[in-house]
Amino acid sequence: MINRIVSFFILCLVLCIPLCVAYFHSGELMMRFVFFWPFFMSIMWIVGGVYFWVYRERRWPWGENAPAPQLKDNPSISIIIPCFNEEKNVEETIHAALAQRYENIEVIAVNDGSTDKTRAILDRMAAQIPHLRVIHLAQNQGKAIALKTGAAAAKSEYLVCIDGDALLDRDAAAYIVEPMLYNPRVGAVTGNPRIRTRSTLVGKIQVGEYSSIIGLIKRTQRIYGNVFTVSGVIAAFRRSALAEVGYWSDDMITEDIDISWKLQLNQWTIFYEPRALCWILMPETLKGLWKQRLRWAQGGAEVFLKNMTRLWRKENFRMWPLFFEYSLTTIWAFTCLVGFIIYAVQLAGVPLNIELTHIAATHTAGILLCTLCLLQFIVSLMIENRYEHNLTSSLFWIIWFPVIFWMLSLATTLVSFTRVMLMPKKQRARWVSPDRGILRG
């Protein structure tokens, strides 16, 4: 990984950019960027989502009466389920995986040193179910090692990897593998997670996130060439592609982001399959949500730092839009911080050579932002209602989530990017016990 001197320089750079803009031009220009960057990205996501829907997605068969997918040459599919302390969820997860309408599957559950009753539950199920194989690791090694173990044991070239608390839709495995059968350069396919936990405000807000933000982002990124990350909770991989890049890294806090960049930097492509539904549990407390998003943001910063030099090779030009998007979003977060600090110093009466009269959006900007949130909701509802019909019940929370999304992104980026740049180090990434929600919706 890039040494500490370089990473410290990067941190100084993202702080100096907004300061230089404010000092040499004006604080007002700096704050315009704070408003217009989320505005611009939201428009990009809306346009990209609509384009993906019109020219691809709307033609794909879907619905209760749709026939089961028929895959070319009837390949076998290995569903790998890494488990750590999943006694409350793993049985339901395995039954959903085995209930696929596509029959040529095997399920491999990897118990990563669980300390609860997960081992006993898996052994009992394996004795009763022929298509289920169970592997026990003596000690907790982390999700990346569990996935590697499952991949080594799998019989198929096509691996569908899900979490130990995720419920696959009846055709998810077939849908998510299909793009790899028709394009030999597709190394991975990411699915479409849907939220089960929605009994609290935090849970309902995340329904809005996955309905109005995440899906549009994935569709847009797929249109302009590359995807920032596969979904860690449901993704399919071509085993030969994984072998070429060395499988998952065990020293990265988010193995899903890391493997996505490793594949794409080796000229493999990643596809988004919205019909590969997977029902998941998510945090329903603010503390749980914060810890999860901080981990995601830290993982993105680690991958950014790890791959920064490789990105500039000419063969990786398709990754440049992701690089610039991540860089500008990070600069946006630190611009917000600098703006708040300058404004607070001015309020305290300290003389500065920088003029900043306000940090809140103007009346016109506020109207534009509200209009854009509403437009983003309408577009998302039109697209996602195909897969989840009760989204209107979360109408209020979905409309306002774009604002919450950017505020959460601001806070987690500031903390995680600073942490990674000041303390770049390699160590084994192991499981933590996440907030899985209070009640399951």
UniProtKB/Swiss-Prot annotation:
GO CC entries: plasma membrane
Enzyme class: transferase
Gene3D superfamilies: Spore Coat Polysaccharide Biosynthesis Protein SpsA, Chain A
Compartments, as annotated in UniProt: Cell inner membrane
CDD domains associated with the record: CESA_like (cd06423)
Keywords, comma-separated and alphabetical: Cell inner membrane, Cell membrane, Glycosyltransferase, Membrane, Transferase, Transmembrane, Transmembrane helix
Keyword Transmembrane helix listed: yes
Membrane topology annotation: Multi-pass membrane protein
InterPro entries in the cross-refs: Glyco_trans_2-like (IPR001173), Nucleotide-diphossugar_trans (IPR029044), PGA_PgaC/IcaA (IPR023853)
EC code: 2.4.1.-
One annotated GO biological process: cell adhesion involved in biofilm formation
Keyword Membrane: yes
Cytoplasmic side: 26-32, 352-362, 416-441
Family from the record: Belongs to the glycosyltransferase 2 family.
Biological function: Probable N-acetylglucosaminyltransferase that catalyzes the polymerization of single monomer units of UDP-N-acetylglucosamine to produce the linear homomer poly-beta-1,6-N-acetyl-D-glucosamine (PGA), a biofilm adhesin polysaccharide.
Protein name: Poly-beta-1,6-N-acetyl-D-glucosamine synthase
Native source species: Escherichia coli O157:H7
